[in-house]
Regions:
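N-terminal signal-anchor transmembrane alpha helix
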Residues: 5-29
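Transmembrane-helix boundary motif in ABC transporter permease subunits
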Residues: 67-97, 110
Length: 257
């Protein structure tokens, strides 16, 4: 049995085990308002699937959260390059990045509500949560660049495009990819949390809040499952697209590295 197949069996067995624990806990409690069974949660999700509002909420939240991620990724790359070029930029940004990392998400959300509308809140919060993660990742990648290759490139006066492809991108992209894997999960959690507090109409966070105040525990679990699934699917898709882009720019050998 190969390692991949063995790993899949282990994951399946672990999933079955925890579903069994969930089912046993639901039976022991015996109150749907506190804990529904896995079958009830899935049944509620199946009921939501045909509803147009369900898909509209997904589109509303996904669009804004991914916009925040995209803006954070772009800004982090630009700021990381600027910090590498100028020490004063690094000195200015270091306390800001540390502050963003250390401040609770809820504090940012409440403060941001003073300045932005509820519908834009998830964009801003996703952006803020992604920025320090990818900034650190890009800085790490830049720092790992081969200095001997950089010296050779300078001696032979290679154009910027060739330097990027030969030295900088092979160093930065692996760290950036790893950072994106972490940042995508963070931006979904923080983005939905912003919606739960800001309550923009037609969002996933609004649906979660409504399920909570109406004691619709089945819907609460169903929407939670949707958030987890969306986060996993978008992470897989984005990383697959990023890998293809890396392969196209660097070639198969560079992509594997």
């Amino acid at each position: 049995m190969d390692k991949t197949k063995k790993r899949r069996i282990q994951i399946l067995a672990a999933s079955v085990f925890w579903l069994g624990v969930w089912q046993a806990a639901a039976v022991a409690i015996g109150q749907e308002v506190f804990l529904v069974s896995p079958a009830q949660a899935i049944g509620t999700l199946v009921e939501l699937l045909p509803q147009a509002e369900f898909w509209q909420r997904i589109g509303f939240s996904a669009g804004r959260i991914l916009l925040g991620f995209g803006l954070g990724a772009l800004s982090s790359a630009v700021l990381a390059v600027a910090a590498e070029k100028g020490g004063w930029v690094d000195a200015l940004l270091a306390p800001v990045m540390q502050l963003v990392k250390a401040t609770p998400v809820a504090s940012f959300i409440i403060l941001a509500l003073v300045w932005v509308s509820g519908s834009s809140l998830s964009v801003l919060i996703s952006f803020l949560m992604v920025l320090p993660v990818l900034y650190s990742a890009v800085r790490t990648g830049i720092g790992s660049a081969d200095r001997q290759l950089l010296e050779m490139a300078q001696v032979f006066r290679l154009p910027l495009g060739r330097r990027l492809r030969a030295v900088w991108l092979p160093a930065v992209l692996p760290a950036f990819r790893q950072g994106c894997s972490v940042a995508l999960g963070i931006c979904w959690k923080s983005g939905v949390a912003a919606e739960v507090i800001g309550l923009p109409d037609g969002s996933i966070g609004d649906a979660l809040y409504r399920a909570k105040i109406t004691l619709s525990t089945g819907e609460l679990f169903a929407w939670t499952f949707v958030i987890i699934l969306l986060s996993a699917v978008f992470e897989k898709l984005f990383l697959a697209l990023l890998d293809k882009a890396v392969a196209a720019v660097l070639g198969e050998e560079g992509a594997e590295k």
